[in-house]
Every structure is written in structure tokens, then in C-alpha cells.
UniProtKB/Swiss-Prot annotation:
Binds 1 [4Fe-4S] cluster. The cluster is coordinated with 3 cysteines and an exchangeable S-adenosyl-L-methionine. Binds 1 [2Fe-2S] cluster. The cluster is coordinated with 3 cysteines and 1 arginine. Its cofactor is [4Fe-4S] cluster; [2Fe-2S] cluster. Pathway: Cofactor biosynthesis; biotin biosynthesis; biotin from 7,8-diaminononanoate: step 2/2. Catalyzes the conversion of dethiobiotin (DTB) to biotin by the insertion of a sulfur atom into dethiobiotin via a radical-based mechanism. Homodimer. One of its GO terms (molecular function) is 4 iron, 4 sulfur cluster binding. This is Biotin synthase. GO terms for biological process: biotin biosynthetic process. Its EC number is 2.8.1.6.
């Protein structure tokens, strides 16, 4: 079992130059936002300066500037996707946040083998009816890269992907762990255009939460996917005990890898896991994470993912004014989400529309 100490809220690093106060802060942030809209990209030092912004009032100003970047670089379409847990529990890996690990099975994690194609397709149709444009097949385990040559599960998943394309209009995605270049090509040929494989944390912090595989193992899979022409969906979890430097480094690593979609999960501690007694993030700390990710990743699809309801509660709508332009709707892997109708109503109240958001470069090219 990974022994992860419970850490206090990350301390904000001291800025190299003072952050403006009062009304000057809003103008300063808008200037930075305009720089980014015009094509500049923040350095690590500049991004760390943003982490020195504290207090609800100032964080909301940071969010407003991030929302300006989102509006100008991505538009008003909120990317909607849904997932299905196609194989659950008894995972070989020891990710300290996950209740599916065989090293520390969570109290609420179901255990079952690969679902049938019929079960998965039924859920794909339900996701499509709820407004999702993409549907991701998620499986436990380190990856199909390590499957036995006699294992037919990968072929079953490929066939299910083909059937989803034939029987629905929703786009199939996968999250099956590590893949070889050859497997990535097979997924592409079957019709998978986007694949989720989260980095989860910075390279520096990763060994504190996982020891059964490395951060570089995850990077290798992302590179294999992109080489096969598959879009990379990769993000992380906020609230593991990481520092602000770790958060900034994760965002910059995702930028360097040119990922298209970035899920931001907010830790919802699960009993039975090493992080089960962690506190949930403060709402304003979560908003600050979202806004800073948008400053670093101006054109990426940044997605509200796991923990949205648990951490944000009745303030979920603020994330959609803090740089977020995508949502995972419906249920999560081992926990329940709120009804999709509630999400659609929230979007409408904010003047946003659900659909399929542009990937980096698409929105600006269309203007």
C-alpha cells in the first residue's frame, strides 16, 4: 500500500514580483488574459505568480479573466461526454486515491468482469439521449498492453466500439490503461478518436500516490496514442496533497504533450483508500485551480470531471465561469453524478450550450 501522508492545504509560493491589489488586480489580470488571447503562453514563473492570488473576491477576478480566455479561445459550446465502467475492481495498481485497487479496495467499489456489448451499447444510447456527444469505455488495470495473448477482452472492446458507431451517433472513446503503438493503431482503425489516460499529478508528486508504475509510463502511452492519430484526453486530480508548484507543473506538462482534452478531477475521498481521510478542497481553491489551468491551457478542452458535485455543490456553476468548457455528465466510475437534465438547465442559465467543443486550433481557425 502506498503510504501517503495527509498534507495541509498547499502553501502559495511567494511571487517574484508583487501582485496588484484592489481594482488594479482586475486590470492586470485582463491584460494578462489579452496577452494569452493574442498568442502568448505563460512561463512557469508567470503561472506561479497567479497562485499568489488569494481570497474569494480576488479569486473570482482571476476566474473572470480565465472565462474571458475561454470565451475568446474556445467559444460558448460546453463539451459533454459520459463514461461507463466496463470492468471494475481488483485492479493491480496501487493508486492511492482509487477505490478499485486490489491493494486497498474501497468500501463502495463494485467488482465485476467485462460487461457485454449489449450492456455497453444500451448505456451509450442512454448517454446520447441525455445529450452527451462522446462515450468513454473505462476499464480497471494497468493496461491492455499487459493482457495475455490469449485474452480476448481487447478484441471484444474493439468490436463494441464498432457497434457503437454503427448503432448510435455518439463518438466512442476508451480508457483502457497503457497501450502499445500497435494497439493504439488498432483502436484508431476501430473508430476511437480520443483516449483518456490521465497523468494524475506532476512528475515530482506522482511517486507519492502511485508506485506500481511510473509517470513516464503514462507519458509513453499518450505519445503512442498521438502517434496513431488519436486525440489525448489527459488531466489530473486536485486535492491529493500536491503543492501549487505541482499543479502548475502538471498543466505545463499537459501543454507540452499537446493534449486536446484535460479532465480536472476534484478528490472525493473514498473510505478504505489511503486518501480516504483527506479533506475535500475548498470551493475557492478548486476555482483557482480551474482558472490557472485555463491561463496555461487557453485552447484546450478543460473538463469538469469526478468530484464536481461533491466539492462544488450548489456553486458548480462558478466553474463554468472560471475557464471550464466541458463536463462529464451522468455517473462516474464508482459514484453517482447528478441528473443530466440538471446539468443542461445549468448550462442554459449561463447562456452556454452543450455540444462538442473545438480542439486546440479549431476555434480560432473558424473565426
Amino acid at each position: 500500500m502506498v503510504q501517503v501522508p495527509i498534507k495541509p492545504t498547499p502553501q502559495t509560493p511567494a511571487p517574484t514580483t508583487a501582485i496588484p491589489n484592489g481594482p488594479a488586480l482586475e486590470a492586470w489580470l485582463n491584460d494578462w488574459a489579452q496577452r494569452i488571447i493574442n498568442g502568448d503562453r505563460l512561463t512557469r514563473t508567470e503561472a506561479l505568480r497567479l497562485t499568489a492570488i488569494t481570497g474569494p473576491e480576488n479569486i473570482l477576478k482571476l476566474c473572470a479573466a480565465a472565462d474571458l480566455i475561454r470565451h475568446e479561445c474556445c467559444g460558448n459550446t460546453v463539451d459533454l461526454c459520459s463514461i461507463v465502467n466496463v470492468k471494475s475492481g481488483s485492479c493491480s495498481e496501487n493508486c492511492s486515491f482509487c477505490s478499485q485497487s486490489a491493494h486497498h479496495p474501497g468500501e463502495d467499489s463494485p467488482v465485476y468482469g467485462l460487461k457485454t456489448a449489449e450492456e455497453i451499447i444500451e448505456q451509450a444510447k442512454a448517454a446520447e439521449a441525455a445529450g452527451a456527444k462522446r462515450f468513454c469505455l473505462v476499464s480497471q488495470g494497468r493496461g491492455i498492453k499487459y493482457n495475455s495473448p490469449r485474452d480476448t477482452e481487447f478484441e471484444q472492446i474493439l468490436e463494441t466500439v464498432r457497434r457503437i458507431q454503427a448503432e448510435t451517433a455518439i463518438k466512442p472513446c476508451c480508457a483502457l490503461g497503457e497501450v502499445t503503438p500497435e494497439q493504439a493503431q488498432q483502436l484508431r482503425e476501430a473508430g476511437v478518436t480520443r483516449y483518456n489516460h490521465n497523468l494524475e499529478a506532476s512528475e515530482n508528486f506522482f511517486p507519492d500516490i502511485v508506485t506500481t508504475h511510473s509517470w513516464q509510463d503514462r507519458v509513453e502511452t499518450i505519445k503512442n496514442l498521438k502517434a496513431a492519430g488519436i486525440q489525448a484526453c489527459s488531466g489530473g486530480i486536485m486535492g491529493l496533497g500536491e503543492s501549487w508548484e505541482d499543479r502548475v507543473d502538471l498543466a505545463i506538462a499537459l501543454r507540452d504533450l499537446e493534449v486536446e482534452s484535460v479532465p480536472l478531477n476534484l478528490l472525493n475521498p473514498r473510505q478504505g483508500t489511503p486518501l480516504g481521510s483527506n479533506d475535500r478542497l475548498d470551493v475557492y481553491e478548486a476555482l483557482k485551480c480551474m482558472a490557472i489551468f485555463r491561463f496555461i491551457l487557453p485552447e484546450q478542452i478543460i473538463r469538469y470531471a469526478g468530484g464536481r458535485e461533491a466539492v462544488m455543490g450548489e456553486l458548480q456553476h462558478l466553474g463554468l465561469k472560471a475557464g471550464i468548457n466541458a463536463m462529464l455528465i451522468g455517473h462516474y466510475l464508482t459514484t453517482m453524478g447528478q441528473p443530466p437534465e440538471q446539468d443542461q438547465a445549468m448550462l442554459k442559465s449561463l447562456g452556454l450550450q452543450g455540444g462538442e467543443a473545438p480542439i486546440p486550433g479549431q476555434y480560432s481557425a473558424a473565426q
